[in-house]
Amino acid sequence: SNLIILNTKKLVRKLYDLLENNYEDKDLYYLTTNLTASDRLKKIGEIKKRLLEGDKICVVSTQLIEAGVDVDFDLVIRSLSGMDSVVQAMGRCNREGHRHSAFTYLINLDKNEEKTSMLKGVDERKTACKAALNKSTDDLDIKKLTEEYFEKLYANLKGDQYSDAV
């Protein structure tokens, strides 16, 4: 089963629409806050059930699936974001530890395609995450990466409009 997490609702919808031709309706799920809270809960319940039954499904979602949703996928693809979101996304892959190997891939989408500039702080978080990842070695040390990320993020935000929040 695959989970794809993107930074904008518009891009989630666009990818979902593209994937519809490759999946049966029952195997492809769309999750964003464009759905009502009730519909989201219903879909998340169905996704959990299908995953527990071992069904192969694909979920295209915004970050809403990252926190507080206990799901376990074989493969996670995450659009570059802040390290906190990346770590949350990684927590949705092989969560139960039943697989010998499982993978989380980070993708850095074109700015013109993703259009995150209107989302407060996302571009700064992406820049800091990319810098921390570029500095890392082949063996990923999540603790070290997270420290690098926050160091880069705070350095980027220093003197910026967000410095009061930091």
Language-model regions: role of each:
Residues 20-23, 63-67:
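Short amphipathic alpha-helical segments, especially helix-boundary/capping motifs
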Residues 50-66:
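Conserved two-lobed SF2 helicase motor
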Residues 69-73:
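Conserved ATPase-coupling elements of RecA-like P-loop NTPase cores
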Residues 1-5, 10, 14-41, 48-49, ...:
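C-terminal helicase lobe and adjacent C-terminal extensions/tails of nucleic-acid helicase motors
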